[in-house]
């Protein structure tokens, strides 16, 4: 939780505090989860359409709704984190995203799934600016460069692995269950991040 995050670093630091690297792993796990949520669903769209008898418009909103709410929340959530503390907003974002992933995985209609995707976008909009801000807050100098290098790697891998993981989950669960697994997989990552 937010109270478990170490205090922000002073401008000059000896770089020996290992807690900041644990914080980075938590940040990267959450950002990985939220960005994978964009790409993993792409391969599940046909299964979703069939299972929920969704229209083409419903399918478009599954993708667009997430991006829309993510974009709307992103800047204001980042500013709120700057003013009121990043840790709490980060954990709020992870909680929102995780709960919305449960709702998406259990959705019985296209409308329910779209609502869950809108809410996932809100959660992701909270997670991402706080993660970047906390990297800047906890790391200095060359260590900041390394931390952002890990961040960039997590972003790239999450987007690349999403379709592969989505295909695997659909193959594993079939058309009726596999698409649900593409959302429920985020619950595991979210719970580990919150823990």
Annotated model-derived regions:
Residues 2-195:
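Transmembrane-helix bundle of Major Facilitator Superfamily
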């Amino acid at each position: 939780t937010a109270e478990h995050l170490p205090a922000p670093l002073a401008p000059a630091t000896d770089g020996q505090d290992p807690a900041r690297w644990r914080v980075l792993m938590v940040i990267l796990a959450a950002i990985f989860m939220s960005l994978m949520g964009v790409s993993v669903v792409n391969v599940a769209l046909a299964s979703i359409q069939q299972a929920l008898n969704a229209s083409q418009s419903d399918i478009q909103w599954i993708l667009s709704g997430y991006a829309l709410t993510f974009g709307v929340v992103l800047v204001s959530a980042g500013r709120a984190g700057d003013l009121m503390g990043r840790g709490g907003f980060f954990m709020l974002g992870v909680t929102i995203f995780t709960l919305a992933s449960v709702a998406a995985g259990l959705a019985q209609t296209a409308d329910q799934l779209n609502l869950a995707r809108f809410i996932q976008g809100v959660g992701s909009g909270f997670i991402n600016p706080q993660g970047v801000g906390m990297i800047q807050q906890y790391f200095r100098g060359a260590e900041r460069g390394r931390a952002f290098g890990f961040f960039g790697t997590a972003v790239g891998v999450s987007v690349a692995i999403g379709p592969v993981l989505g295909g695997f989950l659909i193959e594993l669960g079939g058309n009726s269950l596999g698409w649900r697994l593409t959302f429920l997989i985020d619950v595991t990552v979210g719970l580990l991040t919150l823990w």
